[in-house]
Amino acid sequence: MAKEKFERSKPHVNIGTIGHVDHGKTTLTAAITKYFGDFKAYDQIDGAPEEKARGITISTAHVEYETDSRHYAHVDCPGHADYVKNMITGAAQMDGAILVVNAADGPMPQTREHILLGRQVGIPFMVVYMNKVDQVDDEELLELVEMEIRELLSSYDYPGDDIPIIRGSALHAMNGTEPSMGEESIRALMAAVDEYIPTPARAVDQPFLMPIEDVFSISGRGTVVTGRVERGVINVGDSIEIVGIRDTKTTTCTGVEMFRKLLDRGEAGDNIGALLRGIDREGVERGQVLCKPGSVTPHTKFEAEAYILTKEEGGRHTPFFANYRPQFYFRTTDVTGTVTLAEGTEMVMPGDNVGFTVELIAPIAMEDGLRFAIREGGRTVGAGVVSKIIE
């Protein structure tokens, strides 16, 4: 059987289901594939394989489906810990999420935690599926639960009043029964996702950024830095900045090479060498980034949301305390930093997810949403994401 060709004609969006345990995330995922993709049964999704991201093992199920206007890649995680790890490592980047809430229970602790995490790690949009409405006879109760969900979303800076909330039963949709709360609710949900979650800007349309992996000096030509273009486009003749670790420098790209061939441009996804005018071999190093002037600034102090590995995952065997000083691995390099814990937090145990403040000994080109690994002597002991830059 030949592999199906991936049709690039429709815009592509990454989404996922989030919410409290047993509220129906996986059943809903299966139901969506029934009407919009190749049907995946519940246990095909629930038995998600383990994968590694930034040294952390995560179980995640990936399904894909499409509506008339878009192609979707959708992630669903079997366990709460997998969600936390997934959202923090960005293993499955989400452009938007479907928050699943059981109408009979209303918002529960993990509902709140997933919304908070979504806010911290930069999931920009959410749509709500109020599941199991067949178990609630009282219309007023449904109204109350809906109000509660909207208030909860608003309390985490999501536009609670505007977010679409679709009522239905994922189980009826799966079984093909009670179409008014089954199939119709799934179609209404995907219509809402199509309309409410915007298509993200493609990587090539964003401002240029390339983490520097290596530096070479070519006699008679100057200094070449190599790396993989993370986003945007670089053209020969462009003015660019070198940001991070040292003072920011501005230079001009005088050449772009790929596989030892000269090109006039490099774009997102390309592994290139960029020739820099007037920069000597000692003037630039791994861990800095090349970027469009003014697009990214260097910072040393930030708030972060992190997951600390368990002993079984290869992490620390003991907790850490305030003023913990590990290395923070950003893009291509380690920088030492000091951790300040939130008031009232005495220590952090392996397996915790936690918010804290970090001060690095050298500045790094940084934006909200940037991912990092926490390392001790080259061994990964955690993963995190910048939730807010302080200075």
From Swiss-Prot:
Disulfide bonds: none annotated. Residues 55-59 are annotated as: G2. This is Elongation factor Tu. GO terms for molecular function: GTP binding; GTPase activity; guanosine tetraphosphate binding; translation elongation factor activity. Mg(2+) binds at T26. It comes from Ruegeria pomeroyi (strain ATCC 700808 / DSM 15171 / DSS-3). It is found in: Cytoplasm. Keywords: Cytoplasm, Elongation factor, GTP-binding, Hydrolase, Magnesium, Metal-binding, Nucleotide-binding, Protein biosynthesis. Its main location: cytoplasm. One of its GO terms (cellular component) is cytoplasm. PANTHER family: ELONGATION FACTOR TU, MITOCHONDRIAL, ELONGATION FACTOR TU-RELATED. Belongs to the TRAFAC class translation factor GTPase superfamily. Classic translation factor GTPase family. EF-Tu/EF-1A subfamily.
